[in-house]
Structure formats: structure tokens, C-alpha cells
Design a protein with these regions (language model features):
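Predominantly soluble domains enriched in secretory-pathway, periplasmic, or organellar proteins
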Residues: 8, 14-350
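Positively charged n-region of N-terminal signal peptides that target proteins for export
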Residues: 1-4
Length: 350
């Protein structure tokens, strides 16, 4: 004889199902459109833009909170007028929930959430400074003056103890001890130090020196330069793959992606993008690279199977299969896409 199923058991199962579906893992890609002052929220299952949200002018970079619920956007501004704000986006609700005024700090660019999910690091180029921002309080709680020109991108290593800031104008990396609150060292890496990524184990920092056509590998603890890797054609961003085997580098001039072997520290392949600029007028890089589609921002899926690259002069995001090293899809973006961030959550707005 079958035992009757208790009503409380049925209710518990129903509540569990409702809770589970309220945070469907459907993958959302946030793409910032610099010339439109918008953020596109793309559903990665369908490839469809689920929402287009306003930011302040010149959104350049985005960072995702550790739980995937919020994207933080740095509003860089225009050539004529520097920006001084951050935009906070709720991914599930697909809406802007807060604008953070940075006051005297101008041209916010590189940014990332710290592990606590409450604070974020933000570079302020105009002030040659790295900021610590309390996102909940919408306030700057600390500032580290790099004294370097064009402090552009930021990365952390050693469990979040140290921050590394790439300074384009000075060709250097500033190292900041976040626990002690001090600048530890300034490391000269090469002309145009810009893109920066940490190895998966957090022991190395990889820096693209765009004007020198090199990539520097720095020991995050000793701060010694371990290698200088040749990487031609204006290497502008870098991103380490989750398996720790490779580092992807977007090369703006040649409009392709260099794949570096993390162990041998050598370039092992190029992934052609087969795209051209749709136009070059009124864009950050203009016609500096001719008909290049100018690939910049790179995001890699946590499972390491896919990567997305924003082509800022072609108004498109390319999806790459990292097992075959081939392009598998093009995603529509707004005008001049660049910074991106990934969330495992699904936008709920229709």
C-alpha cells in the first residue's frame, strides 16, 4: 500500500521549485555602447537584446558583482567633457538602480568588485588615482594616488590583497597593498601599458603594452617581471582562460585575437575575426587603424568554452568557441561597443 504524500511535503517541493526558477541560470552579457551612452543586456541563449538601459555619457568598462545580480558601469565622458559617475544596473530587473557621483574624481575607467561584493575598485584617469567605492553607500571611501599618467585598467591578485593598475601614459603598473593602504611599487612594463589580467591562481599579472607590442608577465608576490612576450599589432586587452592554459589578447590594429600559452609564454595562434569597420567617424580610435574592426573588450564564460569580443568599430560582439578557436556567432550591439560583463542570471523583463 502506497503511503499518502503529506501536504506539507508538496508545499515544500513547490516552494523549492519556485525559488529555483526565480534565479534561472540563462546567461546575460552586458555590453556597453560608448557612443550611445547605453548598456545592452543580451540573453546568451537566444542572442537577443532583452533590454537597453541608459547610462551617463561614455560608458567604457563594466564589472559584475560576485553574485551576478548587479553590473557597475564607469561613465568616462566625452573628449570635451570628462565623466565623473558610475551607473549600477540590476540584472534581474533590467533597470538602473543607482547613479554614484564621484565628485572631484573624473574619467572613471577600469573597475571591478572586491570579493565582499560591496566595495569596488575604480580608476580615475584624470586624477591619476585608484578609488575604493562603497557601492551600497554610493561613496568613495579611499583613494590611492598612482602619480602615473592615464591610470586605465585595474586587476587584483593574491586573494584581493594587492591591486595592480595599468598606466597607459607612463607605460607602467602601480602596485597597491589594499590591506596596508599603501603604494608598494611602480613597475615599468612598456609603452602604452593598458590591458591587464590575473592568472587563475592569482600568482601572475599579465599586462599588454600596446605601443611596445609586448605583453609583460609579473610575479604578483615578488613583483619581478618574469617575461616579455612579443605580441604585434597594438595589444589592447588581455583575459586569462579559466583552465589557466591560455591568455587571450585583442589586437586592435590587426583586428584579431592572439592566443598566448601561459606555460611557455609564447604566442601559439591568431584567431582571425574577418570583420571591417562600419565607419570611423566620431569614434574613439577613428581611422587610426584603417578598416580594422578594432576588437577591444574580452569576456570569457566561467566554463571556459566560449569567449566574447567587442569590436568597437564594427558595432558587433563576436562569440568564439575556445575548443575549435573559431567564430560561432555574431551578437548585435549598439554603436561602439567596448566594455562587457557576464552574469549567469536571466533578465526577467520582457
Amino acid at each position: 500500500m502506497k503511503k499518502p504524500i503529506h501536504l506539507t511535503v508538496l508545499l515544500a517541493a513547490l516552494l523549492l521549485a519556485v525559488f529555483a526558477t526565480s534565479f534561472v541560470q540563462a546567461d546575460t552579457l552586458v555590453v556597453l555602447n560608448k557612443s550611445e551612452a547605453t548598456a545592452s543586456l543580451i540573453d546568451l541563449e537566444s542572442g537577443r537584446v532583452r533590454a537597453t538601459l541608459p547610462t551617463d555619457f561614455g560608458p567604457h568598462e563594466a564589472a559584475m558583482s560576485p553574485d551576478g545580480r548587479f553590473a557597475l558601469v564607469g561613465n568616462y565622458g566625452s573628449r570635451e567633457k570628462p565623466g565623473s559617475s558610475l551607473t549600477l544596473i540590476n540584472i534581474l530587473a533590467a533597470k538602473v538602480v543607482k547613479t554614484i557621483d564621484l565628485g572631484e574624481y573624473q574619467r572613471p575607467h577600469g573597475l571591478l568588485f572586491l570579493p565582499d561584493g560591496r566595495r569596488a575598485l575604480v580608476t580615475a584617469e584624470e586624477n591619476r588615482t585608484l578609488l575604493v567605492v562603497d557601492v551600497e553607500k554610493a561613496a568613495v571611501v579611499n583613494a590611492f594616488v598612482t602619480a602615473q599618467d592615464v591610470s586605465h585598467m585595474v586587476e587584483v591578485a593574491l586573494g584581493g590583497r594587492r591591486a595592480f593598475v595599468a598606466n597607459i601614459g607612463s607605460g607602467s603598473v602601480s602596485v597597491i597593498d589594499l590591506e596596508k593602504g599603501i603604494i608598494v611599487r611602480t613597475i615599468e612594463t612598456g609603452a602604452g601599458a593598458e590591458g591587464i589580467t590575473a592568472s587563475v591562481d592569482g600568482k601572475e599579472i599579465w599586462v599588454t603594452n600596446r605601443s611596445a607590442d609586448t605583453v609583460s608577465v609579473i610575479d604578483a608576490e615578488s613583483l619581478a617581471i618574469l617575461a616579455q612576450i612579443s605580441c604585434a599589432s597594438f595589444p589592447i586587452r588581455a583575459k586569462a582562460t579559466p583552465d589557466g592554459k591560455h591568455v587571450l589578447v585583442s589586437c586592435a590594429r590587426s583586428a584579431d585575437i592572439a592566443v598566448l600559452d601561459a606555460a611557455t609564454r609564447k604566442e601559439v595562434r591568431r584567431i582571425p575575426q574577418d570583420l571591417r569597420a562600419v565607419d570611423t567617424g566620431d569614434r574613439l580610435f577613428g581611422d587610426q587603424f584603417g578598416e580594422s574592426s578594432v576588437p577591444i573588450g574580452i569576456v570569457i564564460h566561467p566554463d571556459g568554452k566560449k569567449a566574447w569580443v567587442a569590436h568597437t568599430n564594427a558595432d558587433v560582439v563576436v562569440e568564439i568557441d575556445l575548443e575549435t578557436w573559431k567564430i560561432v556567432r555574431l551578437l548585435e550591439a549598439g554603436r561602439e561597443p567596448d566594455g562587457m560583463a557576464y552574469s549567469a542570471l536571466e533578465v526577467k523583463k520582457d
